[in-house]
Amino acid sequence: MKVNEESVAEFVKNLQMTQQKVETQLGKALAKSCATIQREIQESMRDTEIDISKSYYKHNKNIPHHPSMPYNPPAVDTGTLRRSITYTVDEKELVGYVGSVINDPPYGLYLEKAEYGSSRMKPRPWLKPATEKSLETIKELLKGAVKAGIK
């Protein structure tokens, strides 16, 4: 094969097109990955083990709070936290974020304490375990994206 300026230019053009295809596929896979984590978080909250012995009524209302057992995701009372779990994806930068859009005090502070615990509360992690549980699916999605992009 003879190498000349025209063949090098065509090779570079093909490489750039392949890169663009791979990045497009990765962006789609990233969105699916974030949706997978979101779904796992929401399901883990729905299925969490609760501690009936420590139930109480919140804020002088007739809404019972049944706390989750330590080292389990937060329990669902009203569904506000579970509904607030969302994700955003920047397909151009290939970055995704998954988490709660609630950051109003005191709820935002509680979410951090729930994940890591505090001096008065054992951890009730929900972000990290859901992400770890989703890792194999995410790896497969990303692998598939790269393969689809280079076809």
Regions found by a protein language model. Name each.
Residues 1-151:
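Short, Lys/Arg-rich flexible segments
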